[in-house]
């Protein structure tokens, strides 16, 4: 009888954990690929990248937003507004931030600060957070600061602008995280609606830049970004992350996805031949330890 009672809970936990760790892999791929796209020899326009991300997702997920007629009726205006923070505000701030600061600094700030913001918002909304999870969030925060500390102090390089923008992006994603938990929507419904309205809001203000950038960008580069921004970031990562939030809750899901700075550092070693220093390695270890505590895995 006890085994039967525990089994469904264990199954739900496994689904959430799988979704969260898949999200880590997708985010790592996206951060490194996007940094290369906006800071290479021929950087792509961030507005074009945003259009590719949300436009592709809007087409792929069309059946879902069509059934909802674009606006989920069960959501209050506040919840609906909170969901939209995962759209244009988040995407444009990430692209801008990655243009101003290296991925090795922006990555830890973006994903490492998510648990901190989510826990803060949850506490404001009256949700209970265990002490052990708070300790884990503290370790994650220390790890992110350790990795980015040298960059934050070097103001003359201008990286601090990217750091501030990335923190704004993390706050936007955290607002979405808490809003989704209270929305009653499925992962695919939330992703579909966010993509649709982000595309509709972007076109009137960025149409001229989008057309100009499309004409100037090689077809191969466009196809690569359709895969990276549209499929990986616009559809897959949003679905897997939202699924993780559904099964694990906001605090636990964001704690696991805070592993991204560590995985991004490892990816940089093997893909970009960037060997992390002692500070970066220490920060990654702190983040991993914080994730284990804040996620409730042990």
Residue ranges of model-derived segments:
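Specific transmembrane alpha-helical segments of multi-pass solute transporters/efflux pumps
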Residues: 25-31, 62-110, 146, 230-248
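Glycine-/small-residue-enriched transmembrane alpha-helix faces in small-molecule transporters
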Residues: 2-51, 142, 152-182, 200-204
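Hydrophobic transmembrane alpha-helices of multi-pass small-molecule transport proteins
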Residues: 61, 129-151, 202, 258, ...
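Hydrophobic/aromatic residues within transmembrane alpha-helices
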Residues: 37, 49, 53, 97, ...
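Cytoplasmic-side transmembrane-helix entry/capping segments in multi-pass membrane proteins
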Residues: 20-21, 75-84, 129-141, 162-163, ...
